Amino acid sequence: MRRVLRFKALAVLATFVALNCFAFGTASAGPMSNTSVSWTAFTSTWAPTDVRVLVSPFTFSDGAAGNIVSVAYFSTGGATAGKWVYAYQIVFTSGSGKITAFSVVPTNYPATVGATPNFSFYTSKPSGATEFPDFRSGGIAPIMAGYDETLSEASWVFPAPNYIQQTQNSVVFGYVSNFEPTIVQADISKINGSATLTGKPLVFAASSEPALALLLGVGLLGAGMFRRRKK
């Protein structure tokens, strides 16, 4: 009888895992798409609702400083409908060196948008545009983007000649996820000797997958079944 109960509990776990993969998709790793989208798509077609904005400073040990503008919203239109959109902009206000990379960790994996898996995007705010006033117009675009499943890290790279230097800013860039926002610290890399990021900015990012907690609960339930049968 004990073996039968153990088999049933394992079957429940296996079924839950299968349903979880179906409902949420499987975690992904590798390059993100780094797709160029229009400002109109980002501000109108994707129909932003529940918009959240966070402007957070960063500082380096050599005195270089700036801000990260972070936006999260729930999309109700276009190809991203039903998903959360996360967008960032690097503003390098003062100091020497060249910003070469930006990453968010931990964050959940990027969603598939349309036929594009691991969807990420960048867009340039036109001069005079009034939407999302905390974002600056124009800027430097990332050359590539990626997601590391092991580290739960989304990253964007600004190599030569696309360095971000003093008084410059990046374009608006980000990714899309099925998961709601949380606030985490971001990392920034800069070329300038041994300068380190001493003041990390806070940004919005996709929160941890809730199904994992449910899976743990089912596992504990199964363990409880085993213990009760042994009494």
Residue ranges and their predicted role:
Residues 10-16, 216-219:
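Sec-dependent N-terminal signal peptides
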Residues 2-12, 210:
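Bacterial N-terminal signal peptides that target proteins for export
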Residues 16-26, 226:
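C-terminal segment of classical bacterial N-terminal signal peptides
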Residues 30-205:
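Extracellular or exported targeting regions of proteins
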Residues 208-227:
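A short, hydrophobic C-terminal helix/tail in secreted or cell-surface proteins
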Residues 1, 13, 148, 220-222:
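Helix-centric, low-specificity signal for extended rod-like, repetitive segments
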